[in-house]
Amino acid sequence: MGKEKNPRRVGENEAFAKVKMLRTSPQKLNLVAALIRGKKVDKAIADLTFSKKRISQDVLKCLQSAIANAENNHGLDVDELVVSEAFCGKNLVMKRGRPRARGRFGKIMKPFSELTIKVKQVGETA
């Protein structure tokens, strides 16, 4: 009479990975997330590897984690995986300051983001 098992948050042919506290703004992170959205995972890995954006290496780590979760935890075939969703959200904003002229103080906002990547196994028709 133990506690009931939590239902899966994703479908049977899906897996996801989530990264929190990425030190970039959500607007900049969404540019890289849009780069891989809807692509096959091998093409997405190639795009992220050669991207010039600084945050693309962190997005690549999250994508590789989602692929590993799909393979090891859910038994999905890696060759048939597609990035079904890649979205980001706002996390905390560190507020810092800088002394300015005439005794004033300028606000500097240092935003953090979070990223969720969901991969889905599709058939040969993808």
From Swiss-Prot:
Domain of life: Bacteria
Keyword hit for Protein biosynthesis: no
Keywords: Ribonucleoprotein, Ribosomal protein, RNA-binding, rRNA-binding
UniProt cross-references to Pfam families, sorted A to Z: Ribosomal_L22
Keyword Ribonucleoprotein in record: yes
InterPro entries, alphabetized: Ribosomal_uL22, Ribosomal_uL22_bac/chlpt-type, Ribosomal_uL22_bac/org-type, Ribosomal_uL22_sf
GO biological process, one term: translation
An annotated Gene Ontology molecular function: rRNA binding
An example Gene Ontology CC term for this record: cytosolic large ribosomal subunit
UniProt function note: This protein binds specifically to 23S rRNA; its binding is stimulated by other ribosomal proteins, e.g. L4, L17, and L20. It is important during the early stages of 50S assembly. It makes multiple contacts with different domains of the 23S rRNA in the assembled 50S subunit and ribosome.
NCBIfam families according to UniProt: rplV_bact
Protein family (similarity comment): Belongs to the universal ribosomal protein uL22 family.
SUBUNIT field: Part of the 50S ribosomal subunit.
Protein name: Large ribosomal subunit protein uL22
Organism encoding this protein: Cereibacter sphaeroides (strain ATCC 17023 / DSM 158 / JCM 6121 / CCUG 31486 / LMG 2827 / NBRC 12203 / NCIMB 8253 / ATH 2.4.1.)
Name of encoding gene: rplV
